Amino acid sequence: MKIKVKLFGNCKDIFKNSALHLNFNKKKKVKDIRNKLIEIIEIKHSTNKSYKDLIKKSAFCSEQDEIVNDSYVLKKDKIISIIPPIGGG
C-alpha cells in the first residue's frame, strides 16, 4: 500500500520536500503515519526535539478535506496531508 503524505508549512522545511511517499504491507492508521514521520526525523534530525514535537502536534487531513484523528484507517493507496500548527495574528 502506498501513502503519499503532502507536507505543508514547517513540515516542508523539515523533510525538504512537498510530499513523502511511504510504503506499507497492510492498512495503517494515521497514528502509524505520524510515528513513521517521527522515526524519519529521529534518523535525519536526531538532536532536534522541536521537529518531533511539531509532528506530534500536527493535524492530518484526508483526501476529502476532512481533519482526521489518529485512529482513522487508511485501507488502500491514499493521499493524506499533514497540517502543522501555525501562529500569527
PLM regions and their residue ranges:
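Ubiquitin-like/PB1-type beta-grasp interaction modules and other compact soluble beta-rich domains
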Residues: M1-G88
